Amino acid sequence: MKSLVTVFSLAVLGLSACDVTHPVAVVGPSNTVYRGSATATFLEGGWFQVNNGANTCRGQYNPATDSGMVTFPVRCTNGLTGVGKATYDNPRSGGGEIVMRDGTRWKFIFGRQALAV
């Protein structure tokens, strides 16, 4: 029994250290494309960062709810801030929208489909 507990504990520790990184594309005003990546950590949520050369935007999120949705604050180096909402289509991809405080709506895409933007 003790060895079973040890094996289970090691498996949980191994999984908790797994970070998975996915490509991200964000399409802002005038079809300005930001590219970057999102990193998800098992049971801890994750973070993303994108840039378009002149501006960088980033956000951090908690694990998805049962609905597969995450909500996250966004902050950009040009001073813009907003709130994003994204839904997982599957464990490796999905998308949603970021609504900035200035009222603009930005498209948020992560996973393989972000590579096509």
List where the protein language model places each region:
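Bacterial N-terminal signal peptides that target proteins for export
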Residues: 1-8
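N-terminal Sec signal peptide cleavage junction
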Residues: 15-18
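Short polybasic amphipathic segments
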Residues: 22-27, 45-49, 72, 94-98
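Helix-termini ("caps") and immediately adjacent flexible loops/tails
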Residues: 26-29, 117
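Glycine-centered tight beta-turn/hairpin loop motif at sheet-sheet or coil-to-beta transitions
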Residues: 29-33, 52-56, 77-81, 101-105
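Post-signal-peptide N-terminal segment of Sec-exported extracytoplasmic proteins
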Residues: 34-71
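Mid-chain, structured segments of secreted extracytoplasmic proteins
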Residues: 63-100
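C-terminal partner/receptor-binding element of secreted or periplasmic proteins
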Residues: 90-117
